[in-house]
């Protein structure tokens, strides 16, 4: 029996699901879980920059039963799962957990809660993805601002020189955690990254991307994180400065307590100890 974690990902998606999945994998490290992601690059990123020990790319969540064994356990973070697929996976697994239902979305890795000192006044992070180059066009023609931009993992390679025209520097995506920790005021287009900044004791400012819907925006209101607006980068940065000058009191985010989940997992391992899954079990969802 093994523990698996699945996080939706692709080059068109942010890595918010993967960051939550990595947080869960690290918190449950004693069970040697494997983090599966929707694309192979995300699996590599999780291992190289999110401290995940075991990761692998899986084309689709529906293909997991071809890798897992019957009666394994699964935690998944995938908003695209249908009730039918959830039911199929529930029948396949000894225990099935869904992020957003069994676990909250505002799970932040414990490393962000450690004592931290900000070294940079301001920082900007849009997202890991910009497939349609919406943010690049948003920045086009702006003046150069006195703030660094953290590069996205899925940004096109040829965009760095363009961003250097708008920001004081472009920080490599491998420096993600250090950048988030060190930026006292972070202008950010990702909800989960705002929560990580908040956990550090820093002051995130959220801005809504216009190319697609952001996930879990309700958490911005829950933690009273301020928003900045602008029709282009210059207007956005001007509003960012106004927010900094009158930054409001935010709600404190707490580290999630995984103790109950760990107890459940231990109990399931003990319950199924020594059992061998039937070899004739047929899982057909992936082929439907």
Report residues per predicted region:
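N-terminal pre-catalytic "stem/leader" segment of glycosyltransferase-like enzymes
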Residues: 1-54, 282-288
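Active-site donor-nucleotide binding/catalytic segment of nucleotide-sugar enzymes
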Residues: 5-11, 76, 95-157
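Catalytic donor nucleotide-activated moiety binding site of glycosyltransferases and closely related
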Residues: 36-42, 48-49, 144-171
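Short acidic-hydrophobic, aromatic-tinged amphipathic segments that line or gate anion-handling sites
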Residues: 53-60, 168-172, 225-235
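Donor nucleotide-activated moiety binding/catalytic core segment of transferases
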Residues: 160-200, 205, 209-213
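C-terminal alpha-helical cap of glycosyltransferases
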Residues: 255-288
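Catalytic binding pocket for nucleotide-activated donors in carbohydrate/polymer assembly enzymes
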Residues: 194-253
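Extended catalytic core of nucleotide-activated donor transferases of GT-like folds
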Residues: 54-93
